């Protein structure tokens, strides 16, 4: 099968949707399918040979964060050219609401179209502006996928259409078998934080507020931080406890997996804006206990707290108590890890990709190819105005 995939977010920086798209493409290619991915990327970024750059992206407020997206007249022409030359059996558009390549592809294409909805919020001003323009194009989507019940419910409420729920995928073995980082396991306890720590919704402020109690109980505790941000500023915020922070910075997938395996606990103190919780799944696959904010998305991944400890959102004292409880009780920690290990296999790519392929096969059953829509060709000027 020839599959075209569109990712709206730039490959210049790592992100959950970008990772999902690349991993799905690799799994499908390994299964013998031909895959082409269209995504924003700067000229200096090294891309797999199956990824076509849609051009350099610009930062735009989206989903309570800042996403790097791509749009404009030249981009619209590039999207149409990619569709016309792709001869795709299926076009899989990720985040069709994002004002980027995904929105342009949905406008320009017709035929067997699948869309995956990753987010579950409409907080973006940009999205609210484009929503009225986008509504008619949603009728083109034949197969709808939501990565979580939250994303599915949002689609039903905002767009009036249902979707099949298929979660994000993880290569469970790559996390379970990852080597430890050099110098690990440490004699002291290690708590992992992963994400953009200068983005408020990731909740680093909650973990920092919990740190004094952690240090009082475990004087040699280490907060292992993986992700982007201002190290000097965070050290200043930590004050006298800055010595307990270790920064790895932005790392590749292999190092991330090793960091997961090397920690005693993965802490996810997020404040909101999450529709799934892929990093929790990765920690579960690595055999690392999870302590997370009691967000709806996290609660579903952790089976209402059976596969990991849930803490009220923005509760530093509760986070400290939960982390201390798991760090000082090996049996409790092992129980969470064992139950998480049983649960995590439902997220393995072998399971998830098979579910996605069934959607592809359903929408492409008539043998019609994806092509540039007649409306897009007739109304070039209107299309470029998007």
Swiss-Prot record:
Cofactor(s) it depends on: Mg(2+)
The UniProt record lists the keyword Transferase: yes
UniProt effect for mutating residue 196 to A: Loss of mannosyltransferase activity
Transmembrane segments: none
GO biological process: glycolipid biosynthetic process; phosphatidylinositol metabolic process; phospholipid biosynthetic process
Result of altering residue 118 to A: Loss of mannosyltransferase activity
Subcellular location: Cell membrane
Site (Important for catalytic activity): 118
InterPro entries tied to this protein: Glyco_trans_4-like_N, Glycosyltransferase_grp1
Class of this enzyme: transferase
Binding site for GDP-alpha-D-mannose: 9, 16, 196, 201-202, 251-253, 256, 274-278, 282
Protein purpose: Involved in the biosynthesis of phosphatidyl-myo-inositol mannosides (PIM) which are early precursors in the biosynthesis of lipomannans (LM) and lipoarabinomannans (LAM). Catalyzes the addition of a mannosyl residue from GDP-D-mannose (GDP-Man) to the position 2 of the carrier lipid phosphatidyl-myo-inositol (PI) to generate a phosphatidyl-myo-inositol bearing an alpha-1,2-linked mannose residue (PIM1). In contrary to PimB, the mannosyltransferase PimA is unable to transfer a mannose residue to the position 6 of the phosphatidyl-myo-inositol of PIM1.
Family: Belongs to the glycosyltransferase group 1 family. Glycosyltransferase 4 subfamily.
PANTHER family per record: SULFOQUINOVOSYL TRANSFERASE SQD2 (PTHR45947:SF3)
Subunit annotation: Monomer.
Protein name per its UniProtKB record: Phosphatidyl-myo-inositol mannosyltransferase
Origin species: Mycolicibacterium smegmatis (strain ATCC 700084 / mc(2)155) (Mycobacterium smegmatis)
Gene this protein is translated from: pimA
